[in-house]
Regions:
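Short beta-strand elements
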Residues: 221-242, 255-257
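Asp-based phosphoryl-transfer active-site loop
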Residues: 236-251, 357
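Conserved beta-strand/loop elements of the cytosolic catalytic core of P-type E1-E2 ATPases, chiefly
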Residues: 263-265
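Histidine-anchored nucleotide/phosphate-binding helix
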Residues: 267-277
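Sec-dependent bacterial lipoprotein signal peptides
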Residues: 1-13
Length: 402
């Protein structure tokens, strides 16, 4: 059990904050990241120890893409991955986020005799899949809450699907949570124990669109949910950081977690991103927060009015900051590029974001938007208020109705 006195320090690191009273390190000195999918290997991928010893083993330098038999993306040519921005035929842009957008809010399924969760920190991993590639349901199940977050090993997990978010749950099957290293890496997710790797059967493959998955572990009654967006290569989307970019400060989540409240959002941020979504850009969020903040991150986005989309935290207990955050985010962008997916717009607030966006080759540079941060090295665009973007985004072409 970690000492309670260390919680505030852990939370500050978890949310990517620099130590209070210190200045941020210069992330522009970090090494550039290749756009190959394996680049996430440089970031640590271990979870909190599960044996109570307090000694979590490092797993850096492990490959981070699954072998072909376990979900290697079908599209590997980065030269074909530029985002589509319009269709001269007058048809909607392939993969655009068009109405009607499903609410994906049907009441979750239950099992006979199911009891309330005792922990509430188990989590699913949202995914973008390109049509035709293997589709995996990924998650992690833990017990005992924070700060223990102990892996559930050998638990039976029931996997339910709400196809097209139509409100009808169907059980796809069951799987068993792993122990450390049991399963090969899939979609960059290394097996740190308590993991779910469930490949959707070919005859149940998800069509283009948005789908919701809900999982229930039947011994601790922990649950987890996730979204899957199936899109064509080149689908238009945006990616935003969270802490300091959408929240009102880099440190806010740390203190709000301890006080059991949610951070405030920067004024007009939700309106700006909602405008992009209304123009057909699929929402996405990549944060260097620790994985156990998955649910709070989703709650923040929903409560503060941000458009719902694919959301990724790190895969580690401590989260990442500085160079580690840049490496993590660069690896996430590399995996997307390998699928043929490159964001049309990105939003950040730190030098680690600037480095990751440059490694991801996001073009044009003025689509790299930084909130109250000047990207002097790579030429991204500074804004001091999201209100500056509203008129511009209002005038963007509608990818659903060109």
């Amino acid at each position: 059990m970690r000492a309670q006195a260390s919680l505030a320090c852990l939370m500050l690191a978890a949310c990517g904050a620099e130590p209070i009273g210190s200045s941020a390190t210069n992330q522009t000195e970090a090494a550039s990241i290749s756009t190959d999918v394996g680049t996430t290997a440089d970031a640590p991928t271990t979870d909190a120890p599960t044996d109570g010893s307090g000694d979590a083993s490092a797993t850096a330098d492990a490959p981070t893409s699954a072998p072909a038999s376990t979900g290697e993306p079908a599209t590997t040519d980065a030269t074909t991955s530029e985002p589509t921005t319009g269709d001269p035929t007058g048809e909607p842009t392939p993969g655009a986020f068009c109405e009607p957008v499903p609410a994906c809010d049907a009441p979750p399924p239950t099992l006979p005799g199911q009891e309330p969760e005792s922990s509430g920190y188990s989590r699913g991993r949202d995914m973008f899949y390109v049509d035709g590639e293997p589709q995996w349901v990924l998650g992690k199940f833990t017990k005992w809450g924070f700060p223990a977050d102990k892996d559930i090993v050998g638990g039976t997990v029931h996997v339910f699907l709400d196809r097209d978010c139509a409100g009808e749950w169907v059980e796809l099957g069951t799987t068993v949570t792993t122990d450390d290293g049991d399963h090969p890496i899939v979609e960059g997710v290394e097996d740190s124990g308590g993991r779910v790797y469930f490949e959707i059967p070919a005859d149940q493959a998800l069509a283009l669109g948005r789908h919701r998955v809900y999982m229930i572990e039947d011994s601790e009654w922990e649950s987890a949910e996730l979204l899957i967006d199936v899109v064509p290569a080149g689908a238009p989307f945006f990616i935003s950081d969270v802490d300091g970019t959408l929240t009102t400060s880099e440190n806010e989540e740390a203190w709000d977690f301890l006080n059991d409240t949610l951070p405030d959002a920067n004024p007009f941020a939700a309106e700006a991103l909602s405008l992009l979504a209304s123009k057909g850009y699929r929402p996405g969020y990549i944060t260097a927060r620790p994985e156990w903040l998955d649910r709070r991150t989703r709650e923040f986005l929903a409560t503060r009015g941000f458009p719902r989309g694919i959301m990724h935290t790190t895969l580690i207990y401590e989260g990442a900051m500085g160079d580690s955050a840049a490496l993590y985010k660069s690896g996430e962008f590399a995996q997307l590029r390998q699928k043929g997916l490159v964001p049309a717009w990105v939003f950040g607030n730190k030098d680690s974001d600037a480095l990751a966006f440059d490694n991801a080759m996001i073009d044009p540079p003025d689509h790299r938007v930084f909130f109250q941060y000047t990207d002097a090295t790579y030429g991204g665009r500074r804004i001091d208020s999201y209100e500056e973007l509203l008129a511009e985004f209002e005038l963007l072409p509608d990818l659903c109705d060109p």
